[in-house]
Amino acid sequence: MNRRQLARWAGVASLVLAQGVSSLAFAADEAPDALITRLSTEVLDAIKADKSIQTGDVGKIIALVDGKIMPNVNFQRMTASAVGPAWRQATPEQKQKLQDEFKVLLVRTYSGALAQVSDQQIAVRPLRASPDDKEVVVRSEVRGRGDPVQLEYRMEKTPGQGAGWKIYNLNVMGIWLVETYRSQFAQEINAKGLDGLIAALAQRNKSNDKKSG
């Protein structure tokens, strides 16, 4: 698999993270593999039906993220894991800025790859887990032209009635998203601290915005 194909499926997987659901009650009743099956189908259908998304309309994708991300993703945990130990020393303001910039980075990084989605389908493998499990890995396979692409989602069962399952990491062909960014973020934190990381993310997002503008 080449970098372009990897980016394409990382983009699809990231949009699954951002897609969320329209009904929290429905999500709470769904098994994690059933949830991923439905979200994957909805995401692919949305991409195929929306010309703006296909052309990488970042504003529209960000609007989708803003409206749907919270129900199905523990984005605070995802960001905290990517930042690493330094997260514990971050102020509430720094934590919010890190989440905001990281979300924009993910959307802008993968929005261009979404235009390449065409006739693909996603098959989710049946989940083998105990009803008492609090964390699971849901495995899926993207099928279309060329070799199938493996996607995996790490999910947690959130406490409280009606909370359901939430995604906190994803794997595209053996590469976990959070771990990939953790190594990048660690270099910036070691050199310039948390504020330096925030500034670097903001600058990267501005540069990506100019390229897409």
List where the protein language model places each region.
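Surface-exposed, polar/charged faces of alpha-helical domains
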Residues: E30, A49-G56, K60, Q89-E93, ...
